[in-house]
């Protein structure tokens, strides 16, 4: 049996030092102090001391968890990973997660719902990408499947259209065919399905600009013609033609421009 001979407050608010039999024993939080009704003269068994220390570790974990989620919403896995960095025992981490969930500070379903809604309002990501991002945050596949299924197809279409319009603006100085190809690839990479991609492109309805494309072709052809000046005329023409074709320009238009360059 041991007796608490002194309790002193630390400089840190809400923290106290416990002295047993005249010797410093361990620190406790105010919560632990109140929960165990610790006071000078109280007699403690070895088992009680062990329980107090265990509770204090849990209280410390809870404090770390609360601080971590105070900056922004987190998933259970994110909090668990943060606590693990403090080398807290697995059972303590689970107690903290349970406590935070009971207090309403951890709710993976609500987190997923708000994350998806926020991205749909202003974002440009499709369901596949959002699912992948949320799975990385530790959310379960069945939970995500339910949340994503609840989103109307029109919402995904709006996001795809936003993404598509942004992509087209970025590549407006490219050949029309190249623009369309890059647009499709970009929407696929952002996680939209084929049906949504096709509908989004039809909604955006990008149109070619023959005059602008002709000017662009002439500039690009002249550039490539200079870059490949070391080849003989036949090989030079073929290499330039191949390059321009890969950039999405029309074959007949390429031939016309190359004929002009060859004659100049």
Swiss-Prot record:
Q: Report which superkingdom the organism of origin falls in.
A: Bacteria
What Pfam family is a match, any one? RecX_HTH2
Question: Where would you say this protein principally sits, based on its record?
Answer: cytoplasm
Mind naming one GO cellular-component term on file for this protein? cytoplasm
* Record has Cytoplasm as a keyword: yes
Which keywords accompany this UniProt record? Cytoplasm
Q: Which GO terms describe its biological process?
A: regulation of DNA repair
Q: Can you say where in the cell this protein is located?
A: Cytoplasm
| Gene3D superfamilies in UniProt | Winged helix-like DNA-binding domain superfamily/Winged helix DNA-binding domain
Q: Does the keyword Transcription regulation apply?
A: no
What InterPro entries does this protein's entry cite?
A: RecX_HTH_1st (IPR053926), RecX_HTH_2nd (IPR053924), RecX_HTH_3rd (IPR053925), Regulatory_RecX (IPR003783), WH-like_DNA-bd_sf (IPR036388)
Query: So what does this one do?
Result: Modulates RecA activity.
Query: Family per UniProt?
Result: Belongs to the RecX family.
Q: Which PANTHER family match?
A: REGULATORY PROTEIN RECX FAMILY PROTEIN
* Full protein name: Regulatory protein RecX
Taxonomic lineage: Bacteria, Bacillati, Bacillota, Bacilli, Lactobacillales
């Amino acid at each position: 049996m041991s007796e608490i001979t002194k309790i002193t407050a630390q400089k840190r608010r809400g923290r106290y030092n416990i002295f047993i039999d005249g010797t410093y024993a361990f620190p406790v939080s105010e919560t632990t102090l109140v929960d165990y009704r610790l006071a000078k003269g109280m007699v403690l068994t070895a088992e009680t001391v062990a329980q107090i220390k265990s509770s204090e570790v849990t209280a410390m974990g809870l404090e770390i968890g609360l601080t971590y989620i105070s900056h922004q919403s987190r998933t259970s896995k994110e909090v668990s990973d943060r606590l693990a960095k403090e080398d807290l025992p697995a059972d303590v981490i689970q107690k903290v997660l349970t406590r935070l969930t009971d207090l309403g500070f951890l709710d993976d379903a609500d987190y997923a719902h708000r994350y998806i809604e926020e991205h749909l309002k202003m974002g440009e990501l499709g369901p596949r990408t959002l699912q992948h991002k949320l799975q990385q945050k530790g959310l379960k596949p069945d939970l995500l499947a339910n949340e994503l299924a609840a989103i109307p197809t029109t919402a995904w279409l709006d996001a795809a259209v936003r993404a598509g319009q942004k992509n087209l603006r970025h590549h407006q100085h490219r050949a029309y065919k190249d623009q369309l190809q890059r647009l499709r690839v970009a929407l696929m990479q952002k996680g939209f399905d084929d049906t949504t991609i096709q509908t989004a492109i039809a909604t955006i309805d990008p149109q070619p600009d023959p005059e602008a494309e002709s000017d662009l072709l002439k500039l690009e052809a002249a550039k490539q013609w200079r870059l490949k000046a070391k080849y003989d005329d036949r090989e030079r023409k073929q290499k330039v033609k191949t390059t321009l074709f890969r950039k999405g320009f029309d074959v007949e238009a390429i031939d016309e421009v190359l004929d002009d360059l060859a004659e100049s």
